[in-house]
């Protein structure tokens, strides 16, 4: 699950880099056509390529209510809601900040690409530390703090360099959480992983929708910087909620185990 979460973070980061050049060539309608084609391709791969595995033993699944109300899973579900709500809201404003700082839209990839690549290198030591020292909880809390710092930094960012620095801090925390949280859901859910991950992914989608709506409304009514203030407040609430989470063994994000 750590690999799944990491791939989601990577795909989002890649979209930031390639969206503007693609838009210049084929326009917005072309981007939607590519997305539709990728969706069809994903369905074909799922149907024809992925093997159908039959369970050898019938495992009794916990009820949806039981999974939803499990305290550790509730913390993670609240976390993924906040993570993606603040993410979408933030990226309604960041492109405008870069334009105001003097960087045209078609050149934004020059900021996103190095920031994204460097963030993946910087997150690696934290993952290794969490695995070896069995300190995943501390790594997760640190990642939330990094997001909070980034949101606060955006409020005062008025140059391309300061915006890029805030983005780097943000992506280190974001990539850590995208890798950690799905694997933690799998560990806490135990025999009800399917149900728990279904609730988790649904909460993530609701967060994306809520962030877009709330972020757009705040931009129109209160100004761009209010979006970052809202994000910082939500992340502070998440930090308080996550603080009481119990520790897990480092193998929760054991990439070698996951890939095998």
Feature-to-residue mapping (PLM):
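A late C-terminal transmembrane helix in Major Facilitator Superfamily
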Residues: 192-221
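Short amphipathic helix-loop junctions that connect adjacent transmembrane helices
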Residues: 92-107
């Amino acid at each position: 699950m750590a690999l799944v979460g990491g791939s989601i973070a990577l795909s989002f980061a890649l979209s930031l880099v390639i969206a503007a050049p693609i838009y210049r060539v084929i326009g917005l309608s072309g981007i939607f056509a590519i997305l539709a084609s990728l969706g069809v391709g994903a369905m074909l791969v799922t149907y024809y390529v992925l093997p159908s595995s039959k369970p050898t033993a019938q495992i009794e699944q916990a009820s949806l209510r039981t999974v939803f109300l499990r305290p550790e899973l509730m913390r993670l579900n609240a976390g993924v809601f906040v993570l993606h709500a603040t993410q979408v809201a933030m990226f309604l404003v960041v492109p405008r900040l870069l334009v105001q700082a003097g960087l045209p839209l078609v050149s934004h990839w020059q900021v996103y690409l190095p920031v994204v690549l460097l963030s993946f290198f910087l997150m690696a030591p934290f993952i290794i530390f969490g695995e070896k020292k069995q300190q995943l909880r501390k790594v997760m809390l640190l990642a939330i703090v990094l997001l909070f710092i980034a949101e606060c930094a955006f409020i005062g960012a008025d140059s391309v360099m300061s915006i890029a620095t805030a983005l780097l801090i943000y992506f280190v925390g974001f990539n850590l959480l995208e890798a950690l949280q799905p694997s933690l859901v799998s560990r806490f859910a135990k025999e009800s992983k399917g149900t728990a991950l279904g609730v988790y992914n649904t909460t993530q989608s609701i967060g994306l929708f809520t962030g877009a709506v709330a972020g757009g409304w705040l931009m129109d009514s209160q100004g761009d910087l209010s979006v970052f203030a809202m994000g910082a407040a939500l992340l502070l609430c998440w930090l308080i909620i996550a603080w009481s989470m119990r520790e897990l063994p480092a193998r929760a994000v054991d990439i070698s185990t996951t890939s095998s």
